UniProtKB/Swiss-Prot annotation:
Keywords: Ribonucleoprotein, Ribosomal protein, RNA-binding, rRNA-binding. It comes from Rhodococcus opacus (strain B4). It comes from the Bacteria. This is Large ribosomal subunit protein bL20. The keyword Translocase does not apply. Gene3D superfamilies: 6.10.160.10, Ribosomal protein L20. Belongs to the bacterial ribosomal protein bL20 family. The keyword RNA-binding applies. GO terms for cellular component: ribonucleoprotein complex; ribosome. Binds directly to 23S ribosomal RNA and is necessary for the in vitro assembly process of the 50S ribosomal subunit. It is not involved in the protein synthesizing functions of that subunit.
Amino acid sequence: MARVKRAVNAQKKRRSILEASSGYRGQRSRLYRKAKEQQLHSLTYAYRDRRARKGDFRKLWITRINAAARANDITYNRLIQGLRLAEIEVDRKNLAELAVSDAAAFAGLVALAKAALPADVNAPAGEAA
């Protein structure tokens, strides 16, 4: 069987790992074994957090919408319910952007949502009809 020399491939593999881990602290950027292990963890975290980012942004949008809705005397869940009843389809991302950048347009949507809700739902929590 012929002898297989792997020096070039091994050096290329090591160099690529060390180049990818160039920003890490300490041994993790200088020693191949530590760098390889850290690279595995880094890619795992990146994969996980790309998915977590979607939920994080949704939470941020809901928080912004709720704050703006409460400034207009309605809660988040009643606003969403009213928009559904009024058959206004606007996603949370755009609704949050409206709440932050264009308060008048957001107030108009809130008015439409309030009008679509049943009358007893608009009453404050303490005054049930």
